Amino acid sequence: MGRRFLVTVRIQRAGRPLQERVFLVKFVRSRRPRTASCALAFVNMLLRLERILRRGPHRNPGPGDDDGQRSRSSSSAQLRCRFELRGPHYLLPPGARRSAGRLPGHAGGAARVRGSAGCARCLGSPAARLGPRAGTSRHRAIFAFRWVLFVFRWVVFVYRWERRPDRRA
C-alpha cells in the first residue's frame, strides 16, 4: 500500500513553446518508522506545493500597476520620494563630521549632491519599481519550480538509498 502522485512541471520560456514534464512519484509504505515518517512529511510537502500552485496570481489587482502595489499618481510618487529617501539622521555632532582641518562646504572638499539621483527610484514603470510585492507571480513560479526540482531530487535519493544492496534486510 502507498500513495502515487503525478507531478507535472510546465516550463514557459520567451519565444519558445510550452514544455511539459510529467513525473510519477510512488510512495510505498515502509515497515521502518523513520522512513515512513519521512515519506509522510514528503507527501505533505507535495500537497502544500500543489495548494500554492493552485492559488495562482492575485485575483483583484489594485487601481495602479498590475500587482496592486501602488497608485499611479505623481503626487504619491513625490510623497514616497520625500519620505522613503530622506537623508541620514546624524548621530554625531557637526564637529565630528568635518574632514580633517576643513569646514564643511568649503572648496577642496567633496560637495554633497542631492540632485536627480534622489528620486531615481520613483521613475520608470510601476513594475520596475522596487517593493514588497513587485514581480510576485514570477517569484512564485520560480519558487514552485525549485520546490519541484528539490522534491524530485529527494525522491530519487530516497529511492536509491532504499535500493542499495547493503540496506536490504
Swiss-Prot record:
Gene3D superfamilies: 6.10.250.60
Gene Ontology terms for molecular function: cyclin-dependent protein serine/threonine kinase inhibitor activity; DNA binding; DNA-binding transcription activator activity, RNA polymerase II-specific; DNA-binding transcription factor binding; MDM2/MDM4 family protein binding; ubiquitin-protein transferase inhibitor activity
Outcome after substituting residue 93 to S: No effect on activity
Keyword Acyltransferase tagged: no
Regulation: induction: By progesterone. Induced by activated Ras, and this requires DMTF1. Repressed by non-classical inhibitors of NF-kappa-B signaling such as doxorubicin, daunorubicin and UVC, and by the NF-kappa-B p65 subunit (RELA).
Region (Disordered): 54-73
An example Gene Ontology CC term for this record: granular component
Cystine bridges: none
Keyword Ubl conjugation carried by entry: yes
Keywords assigned by UniProt, alphabetized: Apoptosis, Cell cycle, DNA-binding, Mitochondrion, Nucleus, rRNA processing, Transcription, Transcription regulation, Tumor suppressor, Ubl conjugation, Ubl conjugation pathway
Segments for region (Interaction with CDK5RAP3 and MDM2): 1-63
Compartments (UniProt record): Nucleus, Nucleolus; Nucleus, Nucleoplasm
Origin: domain of life: Eukaryota
GO biological process, one term: protein polyubiquitination
Function: Capable of inducing cell cycle arrest in G1 and G2 phases. Acts as a tumor suppressor. Binds to MDM2 and blocks its nucleocytoplasmic shuttling by sequestering it in the nucleolus. This inhibits the oncogenic action of MDM2 by blocking MDM2-induced degradation of p53 and enhancing p53-dependent transactivation and apoptosis. Also induces G2 arrest and apoptosis in a p53-independent manner by preventing the activation of cyclin B1/CDC2 complexes. Binds to BCL6 and down-regulates BCL6-induced transcriptional repression.
Oligomer and partners: Does not interact with cyclins, CDK1, CDK2, CDK4, CDK5 or CDK6. Interacts with COMMD1. Binds to BCL6, E2F1, HUWE1, MDM2, MYC, NPM1/B23, TOP1/TOPOI and UBE2I/UBC9. Interacts with TBRG1. Interacts with CDKN2AIP and E4F1. Interacts with CDK5RAP3 and MDM2; form a ternary complex involved in regulation of p53/TP53. Interacts with NOP53; the interaction is direct and promotes ARF nucleoplasmic relocalization and ubiquitin-mediated proteasomal degradation.
Name of this protein: Tumor suppressor ARF
Lineage: Eukaryota, Metazoa, Chordata, Craniata, Vertebrata
